[in-house]
Amino acid sequence: MQVIAKIEKWAQLPDVQTQNGMTSKAQVVLRMSGGRNAEGLVGTAFGVVAGKPLAEGTIVVADVRFYTHEYEGKVFQDVNIFDLMPLKSPQQVGEHF
């Protein structure tokens, strides 16, 4: 799912071990357009996306995927961010942020 959102927070996390070595990891808070009460989400970015931090306030097109899994009878949801493309100017999306 692609969304247009503003980066509210970017937290670089410690690198994680993968089958191919180490990879970067970041936790990103995104706020959708729609003003102060707009919906937001917290997702995890890995690899190249996590290795190129973007400034808070940057408006981006984000490729976000949601996964659910069950563990010990409880259902959990993971939000992964696969791509972040900064928009060149805020005028491209209007004044919704």
Model-based region annotation:
Residues M1-F97:
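Single-stranded nucleic acid-binding surfaces, predominantly the OB-fold ssDNA-binding core
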